[in-house]
Amino acid sequence: MSLQPRDVVIVDYARTPMGRSKNGCYRNVRADDLSADLITGLLARNAALDPAQIDDMIWGCVMQRGEQGFNVARNILLRAGLPHTVPAQTVNRLCGSSMSALHTAAANIMAGLGDVYLVGGVEHMGHIDMNQHVDPNPALGHSVAQAAGSMGLTAEYLSLLHGITREAMDEFGARSHRKAAEATEQGKFAREIIARIGHDETGAPTLIKHDETIRPDTTVEALSKLKPAFNPKGGTVTAGTSSQITDGASSMLVMSAAKAAELGLTPIAKIRSMALAGVDPSIMGYGPVPATQKALANAGLSIEDIDVVELNEAFAAQALPVLKDLNLLDAMEDKVNLYGGAIALGHPFGCSGTRITGTLLSVMQDKDATLGVSTMCIGLGQGITTIVERV
């Protein structure tokens, strides 16, 4: 493939191992330190880039308070020891924050506003409770169902609309853990994980090399015994078929093709298309469908042209309707979340967008795939999609 000078290319990507939020390996590690150490590792393996050449650092984070407040991106940049001349901004599109950071960087490169961007995101859900200090306007109830603020209830509603059974959800949840465990055992995450110091059960410092969240022994039978998590009377969504509450950070180094060539850095993929969409907040999990359809149309592609898909697993009850309406259910075993997803790895809000896009690139390299889609739903009714093409 021949690249044009202003094509947007991903040169490298990395993430921390995912940690459980409740008494997990990062319980004594701050969100800004998680990110700063990750950035240090990513830049160290791209030594041809002088960090002073970074035009902007764009970092996703949802719960922007405490250690994640006061423009955490700038705090991370300073903590990582990057030149003070490099600017930084924190973005918040809820679950889609770091993918939105990627899109902003890509749009800037296409427009000629810059050549080098460091993007990513973080969420320490163990330190910053997602349910505290949230004060939705009561007047929203005039135009939006009050239950739309409960992501679990929106997943319940979506599953009812699409006839998704409890059995199908449990099978999907078990698959996520099985695929993630297999990927770990086979070293498939080695490209993307940068090990870091955390703490073991006794509180002793230890090097965290793998995701703490995966449960290899998860079975459909075990999941079938769990009680509903959001609707105790007749509900089907359980903790076992929901994305885990976790701590983590992810990052990508994004450039114009011209700058990558100038620095002698080899691109992994180029951004082929990007799209956003809105949906009724009551079915917020459906957002990936219109977002992906829009991204495909913008690129002149069909879903059949796509080799690999990473869909953020907010809930099995949400993922299955999306796959159904994108005509991916029959192709799931060959194309979708082949290294597991957020049910096994977790969904640290600000981190997940570049996390799933990085994992997509890992899968594409292993499968020698050409075209890939990363997509996710977003709380309160949005969807975001990125289409990448390997170079």
Swiss-Prot record:
- Transmembrane stretches, start-end: none
Q: Which reaction does it catalyse?
A: an acyl-CoA + acetyl-CoA = a 3-oxoacyl-CoA + CoA
* Alphabetic keyword roster: Acyltransferase, Cytoplasm, Fatty acid metabolism, Lipid degradation, Lipid metabolism, Transferase
GO CC term, one of those recorded: cytoplasm
Q: What does the record give as the active site?
A: C95, H347, C377
Give GO MF terms, alphabetically.
Answer: acetyl-CoA C-acyltransferase activity
| Cysteine-cysteine disulfides | none
| SUPFAM superfamilies per the UniProt record, alphabetical | Thiolase-like (SSF53901)
Q: What is its main location?
A: cytoplasm
- Pathway, per record: Lipid metabolism; fatty acid beta-oxidation
Q: What is its EC number?
A: 2.3.1.16
Question: Transferase among the record's keywords?
Answer: yes
Which GO biological-process labels does this protein carry?
A: fatty acid beta-oxidation; phenylacetate catabolic process
Q: Which family is this protein grouped under?
A: Belongs to the thiolase-like superfamily. Thiolase family.
State the function annotated in the UniProt record. Catalyzes the final step of fatty acid oxidation in which acetyl-CoA is released and the CoA ester of a fatty acid two carbons shorter is formed.
Q: Which HAMAP family does this UniProt record tie to the protein?
A: FadA
Protein's name according to its UniProt entry: 3-ketoacyl-CoA thiolase
Per the UniProt record, the source organism is Saccharophagus degradans (strain 2-40 / ATCC 43961 / DSM 17024)
Lineage here is:
Bacteria, Pseudomonadati, Pseudomonadota, Gammaproteobacteria, Cellvibrionales
Protein's gene: fadA
